[in-house]
Structure formats: structure tokens, C-alpha cells
Amino acid sequence: MTQTLDTKEDPLNLGGGWASSAPLRTWSFGPRRRRGAPVYRRRPRYGPKAEYEPPRKQAKQQYGPGPWFQPPWRPYWAVYSNWGRWRGPWCPPPAGFRKPPGRVQVIRVYGLHPLCLCCCSCCHGPWNPGWARPPGRKKRWGRRGRGLRRHPRRSAQRSPPVDLSTLLRPVNLYGWRAPGMRAPRNTTQFIMNQIYEDMRQQEKLERQQEALRAQQAQAASTASPEGAFGNDVPPSGGQEDEELQDTLYSFVRNPSLVFSPDPDEEKQTATSQLVEEEEEGEREEEEEEWCDEEECDGKELESQEEDEESEAKDEEDEESEAKDEEEGEEADYMEEREEEDEEDEAEEIAEEEEGLAEDEQTEEENHLPLEMPLSFLVGAEEERENFMNCTYLSPKQGIPKVAQEALFMVQDINC
């Protein structure tokens, strides 16, 4: 009986070596739990009920692969125990086990279910958990966390069949519009063409109505005994409004009507002009009969003299007015020049006063007039000569010895 030092491998010290009573802790990245804490099995959670479904207290009975007799599956905690597949402690297989596998084992390895109904090991269903799966699930390798395509408890929602007659036919890309197509390639152009076609139909209808109205008016005018003067009678109010609206609408629709007058009006105006010309001719003839030739000549001479006198007077008045205007303009110009000169003088005086005030301010700031030489700033004459004669400054002269405290002293700025 061998003693194992690792209590995890053999907690009861049964001497089982690696196949001890406690299963090995796997190298998983799941949460490590403390001793005595309950184990929450990680069930695959996907679908709509994953957020609300609490973890099960007891493992659900797994589905078997078929209706024949099966011993219950081993629980997940007994997978690695030394109790073998059919109860009893684990023992190594017999020596004759190392023969090539029979047909039943080959079938089991490659995923086919053997069909013998005895209680041997080949009948206990597939050992690979990927083979035994509840109905309604589809195994997809490599898609574990992405959820099912269809939830198992939800029936497939059958969409109603699409009515293809309501859909547009496919667009004909190459030729003209096919007879079955609802719209052409350029739908906007098609809509605009429809609009223009409607407008043309409307104009055609209006023209027909206008022709009908003209025929009715002609029939009415021929039927009435007054003839041309019958048109001058004003119609009643409602008819007048309707006619006004019709004429306005026709002007909007056909702008050429704006510049061409109505044919009935043309006839009326032509007849009225002829009547007026005849009356004027009669008046002139009467005037000529009334006045004799001599009187007419005297009247003509008098009228010529009066015209000449009035022209001479007008010319004199114009000349006098032009002279008065020129004199007035000259006087205004002189007055404007005098006013401008006075304004310029006042501006110059003000600028001079401002300049004097600024000069006084600068003198107060500098305390020095501009004429004073700057030579006195250098110092006395002896010092100046010494300064000019000294070609090179020695380092002792250039950097005088001053106490360190004086160098770092900061004078009071506020004084």
C-alpha cells in the first residue's frame, strides 16, 4: 500500500495513486471556489430566458439517445472516480484487452449506434457527449457561445407568402420601357412627363370650351336684332364674374392672348374709329364753309405775329433768368469759400494749441529741453577724458568688487 504525500490526490489515503476517490481539479479558468461553498454548474445560457432563469438546484435528468434500456448516466462528479463504469472499484483491464478492436468498438468510435439490445457496454449509448443531445438541438462545432438559430421551444414563425403582383417589376436597364414595368429607369422624368401630359390635356379642354363659348356668343349676336350694339349691353353680375375668371384663366394659360385683343372688340373698335373719322371730316368741312378766304388770311397773319412776339419775349425771359442764376451761383460760391477758410483757420489754431499742450507734457516728463546737449550726462570733463583715453577695460575695472549682500539686495520699489 503506497502512501501519497498529496492529499488532493488521495484524501482518504486509499493508496489508489492517480485514480483516487476525489476527482482531479481541472486547469480551468472558471472561478475558484472555497471549501464548502456550493458548486454552481455552468450551464450553457443563451436564448431569451437566459437572464431570468436561476441555476438549477438539482441536475436535470439527461435525455437518453433512444427508447431502449439504459442505465442512468454517471453524474458529472463521478467521471474520474476509481469506481468503474459498472459499479465496483476500478481495476486495470485484463491482459487480453490489447487485441485489435472488434466491429462493435469500431462502430462506436466512428459514431454509429450499435443495434444490439442486450445490457452490454456497447448498448449504453454513445460515450462522447457530443453524440447524445436533446432533440431539437443541432451541434455546430465552433459556435458554442453564439446562441441557437432557432430557440427549441419556439415554433418556426412562418411568414405569409409574398404577393408578387404588388411588387414593381424589375427595371429594364438596356432597352425601352417593357410593357409590364410600372415605372421607367428615370422615375423623376416619368413623373414630369405625366404632369406635362396632364397640363396639355387641360389646355386642350380649355380651348374646346373657348371655341364653344365663341360659337354660342356668335349665335346669340346673330339672333339679337341690335347687331353690333347688342354686345355693349352689360351682362348680369354672375355671368360677368364667370367671364372675367375665364378670360383671366385663358390669359394665364396662353400668354399670347395677352397681346392679341379679342376679335369682337377688334370689330367694335374698327367701326367706332371709322365713325369718329367721318364726324371730324364733317366738322372741318363746316368750318371751312363758315370762314371766308379773307378772314382766314387775316387770322393767319395775326396768329403769325402773335407767335413771333411771344417767342421774342420767351427768349428775353430766358436770358435774364440765366444771368440771375449765374450771379446767384457766384455769390453762393464766394460765401462757401469764405466759410471754408474760416473753418480751416479755426482747425489750425486748435491743432497748434493741442501741439503746445503736448510739448509741455513731454517737457514735464523728460525735464530736458530738446536743445540741451547730452554731453553732461557722461560726467565731468576729467572723467570724460579718462573714459576716452582708456582703450581696454581691465577685468578689475569692468567687474568691480562688491559685497555679495549688496548684489542680492532688492531696493524698495514703492519709494
Swiss-Prot record:
Predominant subcellular localization, coarse grouping: nucleus
Highest taxon, organism lineage: Eukaryota
Biased composition (Acidic residues): 275-363
Region (Disordered): 1-20, 29-64, 133-162, 202-241, 255-372
InterPro entries for this protein: CCER1 (IPR027889), Coiled-coil_domain (IPR052696)
Feature: compositional bias, Basic residues: 31-46, 135-156
Protein name as catalogued: Coiled-coil domain-containing glutamate-rich protein 1
